[in-house]
Amino acid sequence: MATKTSNFVSLRVSLFILLLFISSQVAIADAKHLQQLRRKLQIVRRSRSQRGRQYNPPTLRVPPPPPPPLPQMPSAATPPPMPQLSPLQPKMHVSSLQPQMLYPPPSLPYASSPTST
């Protein structure tokens, strides 16, 4: 029976301490709120004392015009268009291992011949 009473007393004491803590927190919050209200009241009193001043409505800010569009550049992901070969030029077979040749190579016998000049 003695342990039940001591448990009950300790429970009541802990609840009382908890109640004191909560009430102190509420009092602190009320004091902060009251201080904010006092500041607002002082601001209103100052603005009422300056009634002789003319009211200037806030000016509207006009957004700047949009920048001119940038010239369209071909993106790096798309290759440049292939030049069109005329029907007189022979079509060349392009291998994936060799560089792409757009025109047929010059004929070698004439270029390397020492007697061509």
From Swiss-Prot:
Induction: Accumulates upon infection by generalist herbivores such as Spodoptera littoralis. Induced by wounding. Residues 42-117 are annotated as: Disordered. Disulfide bonds: none annotated. One of its GO terms (molecular function) is receptor serine/threonine kinase binding. GO terms for biological process: response to herbivore; response to insect; response to wounding. Its main location: membrane. Keywords: Apoplast, Cell membrane, Cleavage on pair of basic residues, Membrane, Secreted, Signal. GO terms for cellular component: apoplast; plasma membrane. Interacts with MIK2 (via extracellular leucine-rich repeat domain); this interaction triggers the formation of complex between MIK2 and the BAK1/SERK3 and SERK4 coreceptors, and subsequent BAK1 activation by phosphorylation. This is Serine rich endogenous peptide 5. It comes from Arabidopsis thaliana. The lineage of its organism: Eukaryota, Viridiplantae, Streptophyta, Embryophyta, Tracheophyta. The gene is PROSCOOP5.
